[in-house]
Amino acid sequence: MPRAPHFMPLLLLLLLLSLPHTQAAFPQDPLPLLISDLQGTSPLSWFRGLEDDAVAAELGLDFQRFLTLNRTLLVAARDHVFSFDLQAEEEGEGLVPNKYLTWRSQDVENCAVRGKLTDECYNYIRVLVPWDSQTLLACGTNSFSPVCRSYGITSLQQEGEELSGQARCPFDATQSNVAIFAEGSLYSATAADFQASDAVVYRSLGPQPPLRSAKYDSKWLREPHFVQALEHGDHVYFFFREVSVEDARLGRVQFSRVARVCKRDMGGSPRALDRHWTSFLKLRLNCSVPGDSTFYFDVLQALTGPVNLHGRSALFGVFTTQTNSIPGSAVCAFYLDEIERGFEGKFKEQRSLDGAWTPVSEDRVPSPRPGSCAGVGGAALFSSSRDLPDDVLTFIKAHPLLDPAVPPVTHQPLLTLTSRALLTQVAVDGMAGPHSNITVMFLGSNDGTVLKVLTPGGRSGGPEPILLEEIDAYSPARCSGKRTAQTARRIIGLELDTEGHRLFVAFSGCIVYLPLSRCARHGACQRSCLASQDPYCGWHSSRGCVDIRGSGGTDVDQAGNQESMEHGDCQDGATGSQSGPGDSAYGVRRDLPPASASRSVPIPLLLASVAAAFALGASVSGLLVSCACRRAHRRRGKDIETPGLPRPLSLRSLARLHGGGPEPPPPSKDGDAVQTPQLYTTFLPPPEGVPPPELACLPTPESTPELPVKHLRAAGDPWEWNQNRNNAKEGPGRSRGGHAAGGPAPRVLVRPPPPGCPGQAVEVTTLEELLRYLHGPQPPRKGAEPPAPLTSRALPPEPAPALLGGPSPRPHECASPLRLDVPPEGRCASAPARPALSAPAPRLGVGGGRRLPFSGHRAPPALLTRVPSGGPSRYSGGPGKHLLYLGRPEGYRGRALKRVDVEKPQLSLKPPLVGPSSRQAVPNGGRFNF
């Protein structure tokens, strides 16, 4: 018996003991300390558009983008640009524009001809950037015919002529674009054609020559969605997402990228990259959760400008999973110096169309390094990019992708959300708190929720982010329009006004501003004020919980008395309010005090208890299974040792006893096909009046052709043909119990025992005794021919063709079957006395040596009588009829004896036939290929 069950509990115990040391790599979503909405907010906090604008009343504002200049908030929308004085808004006048410009499309008719809807044929202001300190550049879609204008920042009056907006502004308002002025030139990234098939990074409107990216080259840009552009050092950086080229085998997988170009790039030579960028490089932004299997947030949604983080300039970005993946969002920060260092990495290439992208070895990279700015660093010897060698220009055109990806700060996301709506926008205040050293993130989602998050290592110094507040900022009554509910609730813009202590939230149909904190809700309860952990709130001894703005809150306490926070109800000397529904701290989530926490069961102890209980149960289960298996094994051994029939007499064995029989009946005269007897039958007695079915010509080992075997030897004994290896090992003292016949095999049929048969029968225990009885002397019957002489019966006939490798008989070629039947009615004749059975029951070697296992659950065979199939039953009470009982030895108890009425055959025995010229022989060991 295998002893595996004894080791299973030990293995399970070791596995369970290792579980407490395993930690989940994926961070959990933080729970909000406070959930609020905008109920009770003043209507002046909302802006939907001009009151006399019928289109705005129907469609809403159709917000496009924010721009803050000198305490002035500019809002680009459909057909308008609104200007809000933040100083006046701070004084409480509400969100009312002090001036605005109107710029309507003059090409509505052509837009309709192009197959566009009326709602799309407006002028959506997609570009709004400062040209200089006095001038503003604005570009609109102009009914799918983009144009640009310049306006005065203070007056919002047009200055100069209109300019073409192609490659500066998209044709469709749903297409992405970014733009920025750097050293007097406009750097823009958008789609340059009506079908949005030509994505371009373009420079224009400056003293330097216009340049663009390679056209229709997927290695440079492949269906990009531009998010942000900024100037840093000698380069201009573009942040976008695009369909990956290095993982194209995975399908349309989007990756987040950052690309850069040199501000002093003058283009290539006439031989390579003429009027194209010679410094365009890009690499991947890696925002992922580390682990054995890295989980990526690949889709860049929004990005901030440079923010101070730990004394270094960093960019905060919102990333999401793929559109067909599990919804999830993450916030990752990247240091600008790490991004610059990433552009010094190795180049990547694809050797073959189906091959993987691999780094290029350094010995294949030309000098100076491709992508370097001419006149700086390694390319300082070249005054202009037009003077660069051709091999450098050719290399940079074919290898714009770099490796590896830029890692995030702390090499993991600052925040992950998997059970909430997807994040869409981000705004960061890196100078929060009384000492301007706390970083607070404001995140917008696609369900209209604003999340206020304290970054890890903030005020509490913990490693996990703290979700301070969750605000539902959407109002269907003020922001709904013809847009769908999902599109209308999506936050598409966030603008932070730290001086005014406000956050502007933009939806498609409206904009609203929120205060950065609402400390007054905590009232005079010190515990509630400090438990909120809001860096914009602090406890003042005389004024209670107040707002902290900049460095003016140095006299405000944000730590408080820890003892007063841990014990007792929320009481204050000024109000005397207590904890409860009326307390301002009621509903604020906070940590349990240590006294309550100590009453809980430690997690290691709980896990150890569970592991011990499971191990004990596994041990008991293994012991029970082992005992059951041993008991079953002993019972099986007893069954094998029980004396009795080695196996019951099968149909094949009985058929082999009667090799001869009458000829098959002639075909019917009416031409009908002879019915094929059933191949399978049952041992159950048939109902009354129903003729017994016939069995098909059962295949026998003699009728199965035997494959030729190497190293054949002649059979030494003609009786060895049908004996197996077991018969050969028992020596000559064993009697042959099998009979090989070259003729067709008989068919047998089982019938129920006849009623009224007397007890005159011969009990047969083994097939050897049955053959001994059949071959013994038999009284002659009336009218029967005398038996053939013994000498004629003992001589072996000529070898049958079937035994010498000839074709096996088919079912329709079989001889007429002999049926073992019972006498239908009448009285049974007297049978001679049963011969004494003194020898032990030998094993039966019938059927080519194949032994069937004896089963104690097998039903006993029915009474069998041998009757010709073609004529009436031979059963009668006259002489020559004998009853045979297939009995069991004395050691096999508990079952009734079985009777078989068998008529002794009048045919001669057919011993195995082996021709002298036959090339077939029994293989070594007496095995047969049946």
From Swiss-Prot:
Belongs to the semaphorin family. Residues 30-516 form the Sema domain. Residues 626-930 are cytoplasmic. It comes from Homo sapiens (Human). Glycans are attached at N70, N286, N437. One of its GO terms (cellular component) is plasma membrane. Its main location: membrane. Shows growth cone collapsing activity on dorsal root ganglion (DRG) neurons in vitro. May be a stop signal for the DRG neurons in their target areas, and possibly also for other neurons. May also be involved in the maintenance and remodeling of neuronal connections. Residues 829-844 have a biased composition (Low complexity). The chain crosses the membrane at residues 605-625. One of its GO terms (molecular function) is chemorepellent activity. It is found in: Cell membrane. Residues 25-604 are extracellular. It is a single-pass type I membrane protein. This is Semaphorin-6C. Residues 1-24 form the signal peptide. Residues 554-593, 654-674, 716-761, 775-882, 908-930 are annotated as: Disordered. Disulfide bonds join C111-C121, C139-C148, C262-C373, C287-C332, C479-C510, C519-C537, C525-C570, C529-C545. In adult tissues, expressed only in skeletal muscle. GO terms for biological process: axon guidance; negative regulation of axon extension; neural crest cell migration; positive regulation of cell migration; semaphorin-plexin signaling pathway. The gene is SEMA6C. Keywords: Cell membrane, Developmental protein, Differentiation, Disulfide bond, Glycoprotein, Membrane, Neurogenesis, Signal, Transmembrane, Transmembrane helix.
